[in-house]
Amino acid sequence: LNPATTTAAQVIDAEGQLLTPPFVDAHFHMDATLSYGLPRINQSGTLLEGIALWGELKPQLTQEELIERAMTYCDWAVGRGLLAIRSHVDVCDSRLLAVEALLEVKHRVAPYLDLQLVAFPQDGVLRSPGAFDNLQRALAMGVDVVGGIPHFERTMADGASSIRLLCELAAAQGKLVDMH
């Protein structure tokens, strides 16, 4: 636009400071945020050990602690310029405790943070008994996006089948898809 052809409602002199659009975190796992050392430290530093530790921690989680840690993270994120986050939330626990907690967080932060939730079958939608039903329940509760982890299925064929299954579900419900 030519500055001479538009009139600003307000002019702010940033005095040489940098002004940018807000940051976006397009891939996060807010249900696991601030859980370092729980139930213990990942000694190998590998993803597989991290996933195993998460599996050990899930039965011990409470909704209150999930909400508290997620709210702390959201406050930190906004303070550093993040105003949109897409977070995966594990749906392999039939209690859907993390889903309930992050839906509550989404409601609380809605006035200042765009939090989009992905129903994520951490242990594989085909590999983990009940995961597909849990994923559908999470979507019915208000989760925004269908997630998947095809490389974590038992075989490449199962991985391909999981992609088809999840994409068909997303298409039927008019949802986006975000797979690892």
Identify the residue ranges that each predicted region occupies.
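Histidine-rich, glycine-flanked metal-binding segment
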Residues: 1-20
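Divalent metal-coordination and catalytic microenvironments
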Residues: 16, 27, 81, 146, ...
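Di-metal (Zn2+ and/or Mg2+/Mn2+) metal-binding site signature of metallo-dependent hydrolases
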Residues: 17-39
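Active-site gating loops and adjacent loop-to-helix segments of metal-dependent hydrolytic enzymes
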Residues: 34-66, 142-145, 166-169, 173-175
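Divalent metal-binding segments
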Residues: 44-97, 151-157
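Short, acidic/polar
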Residues: 65-76, 126-138
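A cross-domain feature marking catalytic cores of carbohydrate-active enzymes
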Residues: 89, 117-122, 148-150, 179
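Histidine/acidic residue-rich metal-binding segments in metalloenzymes
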Residues: 97-111, 127-180
